[in-house]
Each structure stands twice: as structure tokens, then as C-alpha cells.
Amino acid sequence: MSVGCACPGCSSKSFKLYSPKEPPNGNAFPPFHPGTMLDRDVGPTPMYPPTYLEPGIGRHTPYGNQTDYRIFELNKRLQNWTEECDNLWWDAFTTEFFEDDAMLTITFCLEDGPKRYTIGRTLIPRYFRSIFEGGATELYYVLKHPKEAFHSNFVSLDCDQGSMVTQHGKPMFTQVCVEGRLYLEFMFDDMMRIKTWHFSIRQHRELIPRSILAMHAQDPQMLDQLSKNITRCGLSNSTLNYLRLCVILEPMQELMSRHKTYSLSPRDCLKTCLFQKWQRMVAPPAEPTRQQPSKRRKRKMSGGSTMSSGGGNTNNSNSKKKSPASTFALSSQVPDVMVVGEPTLMGGEFGDEDERLITRLENTQFDAANGIDDEDSFNNSPALGANSPWNSKPPSSQESKSENPTSQASQ
């Protein structure tokens, strides 16, 4: 089955690609007779042409995109439906084409306003089953000019001219074409299962053969019955009732799963779920991670300073012992003071007495300009000891001149 387009330069390849009777590469399927259903559990599946199975025999190009092929396989599996198909058959169908966390969304507009129904993986099998329970004997999807896009971990298929076609045999033969936008997300792996299914219905048409109208042309009552739609927005009453029921069933999936897993009573399951939901609502938001202050590089001391520090180790012992007391006094006066103690790195052994205390002030409330003119606090600083190099004044020019002759005489 192929439908051509009269427009110049227009190709009907995309329509042929999704024809339910033809595989994606255009080779015809074995003849399909309406009224005879194929079941994979009842009879053997018809053989495909060699070009459809083995890439090396008679096939020069791949059979099209993987998403196209998955839609064709979904239509083929739906054609195998029979009235004997039970819940296990529908669950296997859903497992084959839908992910474990898949979501199916249907949007349409009725007389009382727009509707939107979203169901999870557990309720998807019953949705497809409700279509056949509503009187449909055949179901397939036709996508025209779809757009495929690759993402990080999934492939999206967006078709603005998608159609869901169902055929009904009761009360009389009717073909229902539901037109809308179909958006699918396939996981980008070997199985290519659907993660997101969103079908936005715009309009629908119900087609009746002219032969039936000719048979009842003289019966006004029958013509009035034929003029009435058998669906609402392309969906049967069975499907609409199930979608309304899913509004209650979908939130209860967590309760049902907990009841099946832990064998709790419905009341206990409800209490547990409500308590966990309350904990998620009350839990404080995670605090943003604070940036750690960059560590300051330690300056290496020159050799002369090392010798002087080594030579004056005994003389400076008193100042080292005095520094902790003055440091703690300073920290007690100024609020928000951090005192950092580090062992000495130059000579000596690590111990209580031989230890260097480094004081670092970090106080946002402290104004550095106030201490510039305070000479008393500078003179009383613990760093200014008796033998501190900061107290020694540089020699004057006269003293340096008097020292030079003595040094020359000694030479």
C-alpha cells in the first residue's frame, strides 16, 4: 500500500515508511486479509523478505532510522492482537516497547474543556487494552514527515502530522482517524524503548463506507443513527472512563507498590507514604558549598636569618614564653579572633615550651584606620621583645666610620 502525492518535488517516502502493511525499507509484507488476526502465540509469524533480515544479502542501504523501525514493529505487534490476548500479553507488549519509568500523556479537548491525562508504566498496558475493549478491532499509527533529533541519552521523534487509526466493527464498520501531534522519546541503546509518549489530539474523523449508506438510504431512523459519532474526540467511552480512573489510580501506585513489597495494611502504607512526603517537604534545602580561602604561600627565610635565629635561640626563649600570654590577652579583647598554633620549623624539638604561636586576626568589625596613630599599642606589642631585631636602630654614619679603622688595623 503506497499513497503518492501529486505535488511536484514532493515525496511520499515518509508516509510509506510508516505504513502498517509495509516494512520501513518499502518491501511489501505478505498479503494481509481483514478479519484474520495473527497471534505470535497461536501461529507462526510470517517470514520477512531476505533483504529485511540479513544486511549482506541484496540490501545496499540500511532499513531506515531505528525510530521508524520501532514504530513499524509496534504496529506489527498490535496487528497480532486477538480477543484471547490477556493481561500477560499486554504486559509483554508494554515491556517490549516502553521503559520501566515510561510516561504516557494524552491531551484533547472535550465539550467541558481541555483534558490532560498522564499515566505511568504500570497503567500503560490497560490503556492500549481499553482501546480494543471499546470496540476497535485494529489499531495502528501513521506518521507523516516526522523530525528526528539526537540528544545525549535519547532520540526524540516529533511528528506534527501523526494519526492514530482504529477500525470498529460494531455497531457497524467504521474507521476512526485521530489526527494530532505525536512526540516520542526513545532511549539511545540497543532496545530503543519509549521513555516519553505525548499525543496531542487536534481533530478526528469517522469514516463509513458508502455501501452502508446506500443500504439504509430509505430508513430515516438508521440514517439518524449513522450520523452520530461512536467516539468522543476519537476515543471510545471505555478509554475515556479508564483515563478518568487513572486520575485516582496513578497517585495510588506508590501505595500499591509498598503494599505488595512490605505486605503492609493500606492504612499503614498511607501513613508511611505521608510521613516520607512530609519529611521531603520539611527537610531544609542544602546549603551552598562555601569556597575555601586560598592558602597563603609560606615564604622561605634566607640563610642569614636562619643563622641568626639559630644563634639567638636561647636568648629568645623568654620572648617565646611570653608570647602565648600576650596573644591570649589580645584575643580576649578583640571579638571574633582566630588563633592558629603551628610548631616551629627551624631547630628545636617539638614540645610545649618550644613552640611558635602565630596569631591571625580576621575581624570584619575591626577598623584598621583606628590603630594607625596608636603608638602605645604598637610599642606594647609582644613582637617587640628585648632582643627583637625590630628594636635595634641602624648604626649612624659616624659609628660606621669609627669601626672601619679598627677593622683595617686588625687586618
Swiss-Prot record:
Residues 283-330, 367-411 are annotated as: Disordered. The modification Phosphoserine is found at residues 265, 302. It comes from the Eukaryota. GO terms for biological process: anterior/posterior axis specification; cell adhesion; cellular component assembly; cerebellar Purkinje cell differentiation; epithelial structure maintenance; gastrulation with mouth forming second; hair follicle development; negative regulation of DNA-templated transcription. PROSITE patterns: LID. InterPro entries: LID, LIM-bd/SEUSS. Residues 302-318 have a biased composition (Low complexity). Expressed in a wide range of adult tissues including brain, heart, skeletal muscle, colon, thymus, spleen, kidney, liver, small intestine, lung and peripheral blood leukocytes. One of its GO terms (molecular function) is transcription coactivator activity. It is found in: Nucleus. The keyword Lipoprotein does not apply. Ubiquitinated by RLIM/RNF12, leading to its degradation by the proteasome. Binds to the LIM domain of a wide variety of LIM domain-containing transcription factors. May regulate the transcriptional activity of LIM-containing proteins by determining specific partner interactions. Plays a role in the development of interneurons and motor neurons in cooperation with LHX3 and ISL1. Acts synergistically with LHX1/LIM1 in axis formation and activation of gene expression. Acts with LMO2 in the regulation of red blood cell development, maintaining erythroid precursors in an immature state. PANTHER family: LIM DOMAIN-BINDING PROTEIN. Acts as a negative coregulator of ESR1-mediated transcription in breast cancer cells. The dimerization domain is located in the N-terminus. Interacts with ESR1. Forms homodimers and heterodimers. Interacts with and activates LHX1/LIM1. Interacts with the LIM domains of ISL1 and LMO2. Can assemble in a complex with LMO2 and TAL1/SCL but does not interact with TAL1/SCL directly. Strongly interacts with the LIM2 domain of LMX1A and more weakly with the LIM1 domain. Homodimerization is not required for, and does not effect, LMX1A-binding. Component of a nuclear TAL-1 complex composed at least of CBFA2T3, LDB1, TAL1 and TCF3. Interacts with LHX6 and LHX9. This is LIM domain-binding protein 1. It comes from Homo sapiens (Human).
